[in-house]
């Protein structure tokens, strides 16, 4: 995946994900001047021990570097986790559009974060069934911990975000009776203080 993004930044070609699920086991850096889209909402999933430490969170996708200007367009994707990854920041957004020439050219359109509740996440009703009669502890919730954060927009960054949503599953989508489930996620979206406009 990293080589594909690096190549696209040089060639100007659009990165196109065929429909399917793609596992990411360490940070992928998205350079500026990349356009990314998918067929029928392919799924990009953070998984593995690299993302296991909630005291040392790491991004799955790191878009640009802090203070970097450029264009990145992401559309028609779903971001998930496979298994508990309490140290995963699903997207770290570092890039800022050069608003003098290309206002709102760094952004995410029609892409969504969905944590648990669906096939392949390993965070479903067979593991994380809601049980209101049981006291939950950090240890007992370990197998049902989603991510550290869905989206972190860092200082000096900005973006245009349209038709995006984040959902930490409260019920099953793909198994049996679609009962309620308990998934524990650290944060949703943090937009650090910036003097740049975001939309």
Regions found by a protein language model. Give the residues of each.
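Extracellular/periplasmic carbohydrate-active domains that bind, remodel
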Residues: 1-199
């Amino acid at each position: 995946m990293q080589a594909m993004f690096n190549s696209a930044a040089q060639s100007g070609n659009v990165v196109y994900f065929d429909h399917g699920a793609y596992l990411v086991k360490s940070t992928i850096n998205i350079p500026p001047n990349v356009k990314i889209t998918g067929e029928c909402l392919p799924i990009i999933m953070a998984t593995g021990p690299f993302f296991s430490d909630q005291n040392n969170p790491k991004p799955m996708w790191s878009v640009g570097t802090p203070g970097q200007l450029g264009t990145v367009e992401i559309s028609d994707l779903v971001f998930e986790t496979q298994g508990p990854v309490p140290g995963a920041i699903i997207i770290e957004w570092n890039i800022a559009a050069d608003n003098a020439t290309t206002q709102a050219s760094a952004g995410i359109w029609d892409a969504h974060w969905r944590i648990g509740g669906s096939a392949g996440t390993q965070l479903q009703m067979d593991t994380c069934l809601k049980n209101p009669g049981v006291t939950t502890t950090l240890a007992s919730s370990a197998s049902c911990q989603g991510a550290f954060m869905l989206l972190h927009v860092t200082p000096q960054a900005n973006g245009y975000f349209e038709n995006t949503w984040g959902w930490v599953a409260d019920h099953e989508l793909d198994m049996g009776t679609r009962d309620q489930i308990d998934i524990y996620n650290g944060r949703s979206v943090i937009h650090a203080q910036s003097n740049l406009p975001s939309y």
